Amino acid sequence: MNRWPVLLLLVFSLDSYVKEETFLSGDLASVSVLSENVNGVIIKVKDDNKKIIPIPYLYEDKNIFIEAINTNIKAKYVNYGESRITIKNESLVNLSPNDSLRVQKEAKLIETVLASSDFSIMPSFEFIRPVKGQITSRYGKQRYINGQKRSVHLALDLDGEVGDKIIAPMKGKVVLVKDLFYTGNTVILDHGGNLFSSYAHMNEAVVSEGDFIIPGSIIGLSLIHI
């Protein structure tokens, strides 16, 4: 989960009117669309139709094509800083062939899960904080593990005590409950309209795949952070 600034795009296409503007890596853009016949969920804001467009994490400034609105937009790289971690168990840093294969399979599984969203669910974007703990690591930081440059941290870490209740931030459907190599006990929720949220490093998951949950529902118990 990253920070949620809502930016306004106003460029002519058949279904959208977008202003020339530069967006930031990892942000969300709120796009005015002239027609409701646009792929994905359209949110009504007074008399205006809005579509939320996620801007991917970028390693450099570039123009990116947004298929949902058939438009190119400018996106700017942002240096979100770095974090350096020391892990004593080298088997978690330099993976064995079997662990590497497991990681690849799990990545494909997650990709499959995120490829399909339940459009009967309308996201509200009124998120409840899943735990009370403070933010311990923000989105977008370049990770260094034992001095080695690794992937960017595309999540938000929240502090917690062992056994703290983790609640659903908004309504949705449980689409994955699994113990994964990198993130341990993990739950992914589908909030509709291709909006998903993920909860990792859990002590225990208390929901099952296919469950429909409401805001504030307990989905699991925390370890030291999620």
Roles of regions detected by a PLM:
Residues 225-226:
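Conserved small/polar residues in nucleotide/adenosyl-binding loops
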Residues 14-81:
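Cationic-aromatic interfacial patches
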Residues 192-216:
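Short histidine-centered loop motifs in beta-beta connectors
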Residues 4-12:
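Sec-dependent N-terminal signal peptides
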Residues 137, 176, 201-204, 221:
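A residue-level detector for short acidic-glycine micro-motifs
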Residues 74-183:
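Surface-exposed, glycine-biased beta-strand/turn segments
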Residues 165-174, 207-222:
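Short, well-structured beta-strand-loop connectors
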